Design a protein with these regions (language model features):
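N-lobe entry segment of adenylate-forming
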Residues: 2-165, 579-583
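Conserved pre-ATP/AMP-binding loop-to-beta segment of ANL
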Residues: 131-133, 160-194, 201, 211, ...
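Adenylate-forming
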Residues: 74, 121-125, 153, 157, ...
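Conserved AMP-binding loop of ANL adenylate-forming enzymes
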Residues: 211, 216, 223-262
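AMP-binding/adenylate-forming catalytic core of the ANL superfamily
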Residues: 279, 286, 400, 404-405, ...
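Conserved S/T- and glycine-rich ATP-binding loop of Class I adenylate-forming
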Residues: 153, 189, 195-198, 220, ...
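Flexible lysine-rich "adenylation lid" loop at the C-terminal edge of ANL adenylation domains
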Residues: 386-387, 489, 495, 535-557
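Conserved adenylate-forming
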Residues: 155-167, 228-229, 254-257, 262-394, ...
Length: 583
């Protein structure tokens, strides 16, 4: 029996958020939605001395002419640019206004009506692609594999919400009646998704339907370079933003086959799992987190388990979620034998802020350490704490000049005051990403850490991410987190929590000496790096992020909060014990 898509996907449009659940029928809404053509409307203390100058993400060379044209057009006339992209989505009612600034939020495709389920499923069937494979379900956990066509998805996802608790699945499916797709306004909330909470309490991000559908459909080709029908795999948890955007909605909107993998990079059963899935299902592009690649490398440094698989259809590997250090990047290129492209985005944006837009001709061999160039629609800048633009390679606050493009969040659930305060008050006229980094002369962005993770060492602001990359480039360390430890003389000094790779026979004392020397050579004595402890594992969210704020509090003997998103909370106790022994 094939697994049901209903069992796998997140139910949206339910409860207080919106309309009744859209069900299915082969003829439901057929011919009602249409691609709307709308005539274009009117045009709509980081940093330091010596760093002030214009810094913006669209310039520089190496970007490809098509990318430059698209980026410039998206900023000069966003209404025309995104109105054109919206023609690729089917609308029940065309919008009356492409963009409306509501300070600080932005509304896109005002009064337009659509249904995202219709766009992701029904319209492909109406276009004669009902027998194409929509979902490949691969679960080493249950030893189940299945392919599900668009027609089968439609047939299986038409169960209305009903009160009750314990119900028999097959009985309910047998009784189910089909339901027409329900048109909703473009600004209608599609879902509430809570952030991973690595920088504080999780925040309920509210996602508008119309702009999200337009942006995701556009990114599948323009950012990720895929054609409809190709196999795409986002190796994420379905409950995180990558799962929502690029396991569920994005690939289905664009007509791609999406791989739904219920397993891990290691342990299900081994470090060859990713290679097996890529080969077996003919995956063209993979999106995963650097932490997954590090886990594979830690257990199988030579990728011996992956060598038995032929990856002839595999074209590109995309990574995001945590900064990808140069060592992990180069190892990935070597073992997967494809371009490996880091890019950067947030739960709040729902899609990439910066990337190598290979569908628009961006280079597939960008410099190591970067996270791409500004995606069209995102006017990324680097500012100091006084809102002065910084020169190339000066560390500062990464912000986005308003308006935000389609698909970005419209608010925080039941907390609009926090929405305004957290994201828009510090830098009026900009969206504050709360990340720190710099741009190079070519317009590539280097995201170094969260702003709170910049360590003040005797007046010098040092990026925790830069130290982490230096530590990880030493051949003995498989994973690392750097936090600031309070120091009576220097204010703070960096402390590294390190996980050694498998098979390292050198003593921890010797490794520590080598790491200190290595960091001193690569960053300089200004980092004042003198300390590291070795732990068996780092705490991470299920999306692969390290809760650095909690680790910082732990290291400094302060109360810390373990959020429900942490995969293994017991790791905190282990680190506490290691720190006690070290002191």
């Amino acid at each position: 029996m094939k697994p049901s898509w209903r069992q796998c996907r997140k139910v949206t449009g339910a409860g207080g958020l919106g309309a009744p659940l859209a069900g299915s029928s082969p003829a439901r809404g057929a011919g009602q939605a249409r691609r709307a053509y709308v005539a274009p409307g009117p045009r709509g203390a980081l940093g330091g001395p010596g760093c002030r100058a214009l810094s913006s993400g669209g310039g520089g060379g190496g970007g490809g002419g098509e990318y430059k044209t698209h980026f410039a057009a998206s900023l000069a006339d966003p209404e025309r640019f995104w109105g054109k992209a919206a023609e690729q989505i089917s609308w029940y009612k065309p919008w009356t206004k492409t963009l409306e600034n509501r300070h600080p939020s932005t509304s896109w495709f005002v009064e337009g009506m659509l249904n995202i389920c219709y766009n992701a499923i029904d319209r492909h069937i109406e276009n004669g692609k009902g027998d194409k494979i929509a979902i490949i379900y691969d679960s080493p956990v249950t030893n189940t594999k299945a392919t599900i066509t668009y027609k089968e998805v439609l047939e299986q996802e038409s169960v209305p919400l009903a009160p009750g608790r314990d119900l028999d699945w097959d009985e309910e499916m047998a009784k189910a009646q089909s339901h027409d797709c329900v048109p909703v306004l473009s600004e209608h909330p599609l879902y509430i998704l809570y952030t991973s909470g690595t920088t504080g309490l999780p925040k309920g991000v509210v996602r508008p339907t119309g702009g999200y559908a337009v942006m995701l459909n556009w990114t599948m080709s323009s950012v990720y370079g895929l054609k409809p029908g190709e196999v795409w795999w986002a190796a994420s948890d379905l409950g995180w933003v990558v799962g929502h955007s690029y396991i569920c909605y994005g690939p289905l909107l664009h007509g791609n086959t999406t791989v739904l993998y219920e397993g891990k990079p290691v342990g299900t059963p081994d470090a060859g799992a990713y290679f097996r899935v890529l080969a077996e299902h003919g995956v063209a592009a993979l999106f995963t987190a650097p932490t997954a690649i590090r886990a594979i490398r830690q257990q199988d440094p030579g990728a011996a388990l992956g060598k038995q698989y032929s990856l002839t259809r595999f074209k590109t590997l995309f990574v995001a979620g945590e900064r990808c250090d140069a060592e992990t990047l180069e190892w990935s290129k070597k073992v997967f034998r494809v371009p490996v492209l880091d890019h950067w985005w947030q739960t709040e944006t729902g899609s990439p802020i910066t990337a190598s837009c290979i569908g628009l001709g961006n280079s597939k061999t960008p410099p190591p350490g970067q996270a791409g160039k500004s995606v069209p629609g995102y006017n990324v800048m680097v500012l100091d704490d006084n809102m002065q633009k910084l020169k190339a390679r000066c560390l500062g606050n990464i912000v986005v000049k308003l308006p935000l493009p389609p698909g970005a969040f419209s608010g925080l659930w039941k907390n609009q005051e926090a929405f305004k305060h957290l994201y828009f008050e510090k830098f009026p006229g900009y969206y504050d990403t709360m990340d720190a980094g710099y741009m190079d002369e070519e317009g590539y962005l280097y995201v170094m850490s969260r702003v709170d993770d910049v360590i003040n060492v005797a007046g010098h602001r040092i990026s925790a991410g830069a130290i982490e990359e230096s530590v990880l480039s030493h051949g003995t360390v498989g994973d690392c987190a750097v936090v600031g430890k309070e120091d009576p003389l220097k204010g703070h000094v960096p402390l590294a929590l390190c996980v050694l790779r498998e098979g390292i026979n050198t003593t921890e004392e010797q490794v520590l000496k080598e790491i200190i020397k290595h960091v001193r050579q690569s960053i300089g004595p200004v980092a004042a790096f003198q300390g590291a402890v070795f732990v068996k594992q780092l705490p991470k969210t299920r999306s692969g992020k390290i809760p650095r704020s909690a680790l910082s509090a732990l290291v400094n003997g302060k109360p810390y909060k373990v959020t429900p998103t942490i995969e293994d909370p017991s790791i905190f106790r282990h680190i506490e014990e290691v720190l006690k022994k070290a002191s």
